[in-house]
C-alpha cells in the first residue's frame, strides 16, 4: 500500500517522494510516505488522488490538514501519508527525525 500511495503521488507530479520504513522505530505506523508539492491546491488534488486510489484497499482512519493544504496527513493505520508544501516539509524535517529508517526514493 505504501508503494501504491507513493506512485500515485509521483504520477501526480509531487516532488521528492520517499517511503520510510519506520516499523520497529515507532508504534504509530510501519511506513511513512512523504511528498512535496508547490502549493495548497496541488496538495489537496494529490490527497484526493491518494484517497481515491487507495479506496479499493482501505479507507483512512483519519485525515488532517486538508483544508489548509500546507501539511496533509492521511492515516491508514500501518501507513501514514504526508503531503507537504515544500516550506513545511523543510521546517518539520520528518526525514531528519526518522533518519534511522530505511528509505526508498520514488522516481
Describe the role of every protein-language-model region.
Residues 46-51:
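Short amphipathic alpha-helices in soluble, non-transmembrane regions
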Residues 1-24, 38-45, 57, 64-71, ...:
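Long, contiguous binding/interaction regions
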Residues 27:
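P-loop NTPase catalytic core of nucleic-acid-dependent motor ATPases
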